[in-house]
Amino acid sequence: MSWLEKILEKSNLVSSRKASIPEGVWTKCTSCEQVLYHAELERNLEVCPKCNHHMRMKARRRLETFLDEGERVELGTELEPQDKLKFKDSKRYKERISAAQKSSGEKDALIVMQGELLGMPLVACAFEFSFMGGSMGSVVGARFVKAVEAAIENNCALVCFSASGGARMQEALMSLMQMAKTSAALERLSDKGLPFISVLTDPTMGGVSASLAMLGDINIGEPKALIGFAGRRVIEQTVREDLPEGFQRSEFLLEHGAIDMIVDRREMRQRVGGLVAKLTNHKSPMVVSVNESPNEEPYSVPEADEKG
């Protein structure tokens, strides 16, 4: 065997070994680009163990890892989107719905589950960003109202994880109406004295950020989540000024008082559970103290001046 044949044989052996690695074993961090073992990333709740970047998470997995194991009831499964306007852009809306359902495995962009959090009854919902950018249409609005009604019926708190590009343009005014519809539903929840905790994940934009996502009794942001109404470029072109570094990120919003706290996804169950326990006066042995970590500065309220 010649030296060239030996090299080619080794090359074929290496390539065959590479080909034998199953697909989906490795994934790359979207921030630091570190190659990660996918099973380890899943155990870490889609948070990069190298740089702590919070990657986007599937709505169903988010709810399943957030709520207690055991009986969970999914609400609003009978609701499916309809093309009432016969809308068409480069594609028919009906075709877009079918494609989104096939790629995401969900019927629409919001999943609602009723279950328990640290032994306390709770209704939780989460946006599925892979379904047409988590856009809010009639079904999303109707499912959110069902979540509110279930919380009222069971006299428990409501938690929502938002990840959306805004209102769904293919449903025109019907999608914009969901902003008022969801806001009115939350008003009914508030009238009953029940808490609504809104968790804003990356990204939360447009009509969702301008309605239900910012109406929480407590608004929580995930680290470095993009949160806002219009996009950065649109704002810069409108005001004709450069925006500050980190504009529309959760850290910027916390600094300027737009959200109440930033919570690492891996601590979300305990932190939200502690808040729910306090807001509902529920004593659960599974709830631990939610005091700030030693690295966090305590919040202080400035004294009012003489003018009040």
Swiss-Prot record:
Domain CoA carboxyltransferase N-terminal intervals: 25-294
Top class in the EC scheme: transferase
Coiled coil residues, start to end: none
Pfam hit, one: Carboxyl_trans
Zinc finger (C4-type): 29-51
Keyword set, alphabetical order: ATP-binding, Cytoplasm, Fatty acid biosynthesis, Fatty acid metabolism, Lipid biosynthesis, Lipid metabolism, Metal-binding, Nucleotide-binding, Transferase, Zinc, Zinc-finger
Keyword Zinc: yes
InterPro entries found in the cross-reference section: AcCoA_carboxyl_beta, Acetyl_CoA_COase_Trfase_b_su, ClpP/crotonase-like_dom_sf, COA_CT_N, Znf-ACC
Known partners and oligomeric status: Acetyl-CoA carboxylase is a heterohexamer composed of biotin carboxyl carrier protein (AccB), biotin carboxylase (AccC) and two subunits each of ACCase subunit alpha (AccA) and ACCase subunit beta (AccD).
Family the UniProt entry places it in: Belongs to the AccD/PCCB family.
Known function: Component of the acetyl coenzyme A carboxylase (ACC) complex. Biotin carboxylase (BC) catalyzes the carboxylation of biotin on its carrier protein (BCCP) and then the CO(2) group is transferred by the transcarboxylase to acetyl-CoA to form malonyl-CoA.
Reactions performed catalytically: N(6)-carboxybiotinyl-L-lysyl-[protein] + acetyl-CoA = N(6)-biotinyl-L-lysyl-[protein] + malonyl-CoA
Gene Ontology terms, MF aspect: acetyl-CoA carboxylase activity; ATP binding; carboxyl- or carbamoyltransferase activity; zinc ion binding
Residues the record lists as binding Zn(2+): C29, C32, C48, C51
Protein known as: Acetyl-coenzyme A carboxylase carboxyl transferase subunit beta 1
Superkingdom field: Bacteria
Subcellular location: Cytoplasm
Gene Ontology terms: biological process: fatty acid biosynthetic process; malonyl-CoA biosynthetic process
High-level lineage: Bacteria, Pseudomonadati, Pseudomonadota, Gammaproteobacteria, Vibrionales
Pathway annotation from the record: Lipid metabolism; malonyl-CoA biosynthesis; malonyl-CoA from acetyl-CoA: step 1/1
GN (gene name): accD1
Co-factor remark: Binds 1 zinc ion per subunit.
Cellular component, GO, one term: acetate CoA-transferase complex
Cofactor: Zn(2+)
Positions of the UniProt region annotated as Disordered: 289-308
EC number: 2.1.3.15
Gene3D superfamilies assigned to the protein according to its UniProt record, in alphabetical order: 2-enoyl-CoA Hydratase, Chain A, domain 1 (3.90.226.10)
